[in-house]
């Protein structure tokens, strides 16, 4: 049979067949054997040996591309190969016959040039065997295809030489042409052999997992997969790669079709053998239903996902497959997150996992035991070189340290993950690992830099994220949400509430809970207290049902701030105490410190600054050690207010000392606010400093602070100076 210049017999009965490209590779091997050791240097021979494996295993490439690869390793040998192929293509059919006859001599003699069991020897034997099985008409078609292959290569070489002599603009066009040609090389090549197909599928799967930008485009990859499936429709792995490729473009119909075909082919080919006395097709059926449920869940088809899960549970119960049932229970929890009983499902999942010895979750333990469990799992991951699980574990620890309020440890874990070389990536020839773990770590890194006022560094991290995870990739939503949150915080710090309000829509589309919370923050900043209170109460009820403790505490703090800004600090105290109890119960140290900060502010408003100072001494250390720059400034500003309020009853000398200490703390707070460009708070600090300098009789310093206040007050007009109504 002849297809696209490729002569092959029974596709399933032979693993290799002769193509014009493989004839060119055979010429290269023959020339390497004929060339003496002195003619080729040791470095060039080493490069050629490294080049051979991808040439033997990879798909067919154009002749010009092959010339270029050989020339990079050994220019002298590239010239010999080019001359030899030219003589064969411009000669007669008997030259091709003679060439294959000469190949058999490579195995003869006491010291043959090639060993029969080596990689090169097996390739030569397969090619000789495949050529010997061809009929005369097939040999003639192969020779015609070789001539066409040579002519196309010569034409491409001439075009490249002409374009190299053009100017810079022409060079840009050449680069664009090269990209299109590379895609055509893959799509226009003939059917792949079994080894080539396996190599191609494993390579593209590794690229989709680790570095999607270097993989073929969705259209080119699908075209190549369709070409592969046309000659071998029962190739299950090709159907699965087609499923992954369709997920890239969010094609629900094609991805479902490919997924079902994958499990069908597993049953037909017998790839799923007997397991624990069960037939392989039963295992394929239940895991097919489970994967189908996961697919529908990804696209938001929750009703179809529940139906598929019910089918998977029914088959798993009939087969007594507890592992599959555990997976189904976990997916039931994912599907039920919008319901009030989701936490009950999670508890059942954990109990079932513990009962059957399947540690899928670790809950209900203290923070130190949680970290110990992660450490023990890391030991197993490193022992067995499970690089993907290592990455996930480090990303989890990064998120956990941030949740507990230890930004320094979170930063260390994120940098550790980014500096690691994945074992799987190196074995697959991929230089970077573009998994979800790396996206999470980079997003944490960007947010940590933004919290410290390093917006340029955060911007560089986000720029790298956008290049590493294009907008159409599956993990792009992570950096999109991170970017929107950083822009929102900067707009709020700068007093641009209208800009922050416009960003709420994008945040809501990516994370509904976060978007509603940010909307309430904007309404509160715009003094729309009634609307903000209604929104916060609805969000609080919803988060309490979902057991989202971190967001519950954040909402409680916003509700308390709303109360004291409405001149009701006594109502805010029970709310703050509830938030403090939750943060202490779940050991959220940073949120606990922030809650204590709010309690101290409430006590200041109630007229007990001495008690507020005592509370501040408990909370300020974690904030100064691991807190965001804005929170550090708020803490120092509050300390200054408490010092001034406490000094009202002091004698003149002691009062002057207290005011001097308050001024120093105000200067430190102003420096913190300046790092995040929070001009509204800088204005408040400048006003407060001017009043203190006036009380101390320092006219020059007072005038300077008054001038700064006036400039900022003109840029940020307001109805009054909010020194007491917000923290």
From Swiss-Prot:
Modified-residue entries (Phosphothreonine), positions: 217
Predominant location category: nucleus
GO biological process, one term: protein K48-linked ubiquitination
Pathway(s): Protein modification; protein ubiquitination
Keywords: Cell cycle, Cell division, Cytoplasm, Cytoskeleton, Mitosis, Nucleus, Phosphoprotein, Repeat, TPR repeat, Ubl conjugation pathway
Record-level Gene Ontology MF annotations: protein phosphatase binding
TPR repeat residue intervals: 194-234, 235-285, 286-322, 323-359, 360-390, 391-438, 439-472, 473-512, 513-552, 553-592, 593-632, 633-668, 669-708
Pfam families per the UniProt record, alphabetical: ANAPC5, Apc5_N
TM region positions: none
The keyword Cytoplasm belongs to this UniProt entry's keyword annotation: yes
Any coiled-coil regions, as ranges: none
Record's signal peptide: none
Residues modified as Phosphoserine: 180
Annotated Gene Ontology cellular component terms: anaphase-promoting complex; cytoplasm; nucleus; spindle
Location in or out of the cell: Nucleus; Cytoplasm, Cytoskeleton, Spindle
InterPro entries associated with the record: Apc5, Apc5_dom, Apc5_N, TPR-like_helical_dom_sf
Function: Component of the anaphase promoting complex/cyclosome (APC/C), a cell cycle-regulated E3 ubiquitin ligase that controls progression through mitosis and the G1 phase of the cell cycle. The APC/C complex acts by mediating ubiquitination and subsequent degradation of target proteins: it mainly mediates the formation of 'Lys-11'-linked polyubiquitin chains and, to a lower extent, the formation of 'Lys-48'- and 'Lys-63'-linked polyubiquitin chains. The APC/C complex catalyzes assembly of branched 'Lys-11'-/'Lys-48'-linked branched ubiquitin chains on target proteins.
Annotated family: Belongs to the APC5 family.
Subunit structure: The mammalian APC/C is composed at least of 14 distinct subunits ANAPC1, ANAPC2, CDC27/APC3, ANAPC4, ANAPC5, CDC16/APC6, ANAPC7, CDC23/APC8, ANAPC10, ANAPC11, CDC26/APC12, ANAPC13, ANAPC15 and ANAPC16 that assemble into a complex of at least 19 chains with a combined molecular mass of around 1.2 MDa; APC/C interacts with FZR1 and FBXO5.
Protein name in the entry: Anaphase-promoting complex subunit 5
